[in-house]
Amino acid sequence: MAYFPMFVDMTERECLIVGGGNVAYRKVSVMLDFGAKVTVVAEDICDELRKLTIDDIASEDKTGSYTANKENNQTDSDAADRITFIKRRFERKDCDGMEMVIAATDDNALNHEIAEYCKANGIMVNAVDQKADCSFIFPSYIKEKNLVAAFSSGGNSPVLTQYLKCKEQEILTPFLGELNEYMGQIREKVIAQYGTEAERKRVFKEILCAAIDNGKIPEI
């Protein structure tokens, strides 16, 4: 059975990532890209994640947590405000209050345990490379501002989805991302000015086609 494609607003939503390796880093990057608040629980973290921390984890609070370094990290300051690292082993209570959990450790048994706990408590969970333990999976995606295209093979062939992503990148360019922003800015004005759905559809199509043909975003 294919997975249902659903785009979810993750802005400021709580996401837990268990694990501190390169796979965990990639998941952190994705979740930050879509505005989530990310908590990472791991006994140790890879260099890429370490670059997000304050003075290479030199400063921790009394709970063992440490936050991102806004001046010395590779993300923007907004993203830095949305990352918390907890340096210790995973505990089940870490999942409480989370809307999404990603088990990205190198211990399949632990990933399975995390997934089972989340499913029993109604929490969406992804166990990396353990399809049977996942209630959702990550697609390959392209993102230009608010314009997003995603591909999923249902976990069967990541290589195929990467191929599709590469082909789509030839079409979904930064220009289209900018054009999508423009279309959003004029949307309410067009809706107010034209009374029928058919008229609005015609106007939107004319504006879109003209912009693509000219290779230029119209001025508002």
Task: Label each residue range with its predicted role.
Residues M1-D44, E48-L52:
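Hydrophobic, well-ordered beta-alpha structural blocks that scaffold small-molecule cofactor pockets
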Residues E12, D96-G97, E144:
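Alpha-helix C-terminal capping/helix-to-coil transition sites in glycosyltransferase folds
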Residues N22-V23, A109, G155:
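Residue-level detector of alpha-helix initiation sites
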Residues T53-R82:
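Intrinsically disordered, low-complexity terminal tails and inter-domain linkers enriched
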Residues A80-D96:
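Glycine-rich, highly charged phosphate/nucleotide-binding loops
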Residues M100-A104, N111-I137:
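ADP-ribose/adenylate-binding Rossmann-like module
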Residues A127-L176:
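E1/E1-like adenylate-forming module used to activate ubiquitin-like modifiers
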Residues G155-I220:
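An accessory alpha-helical subdomain
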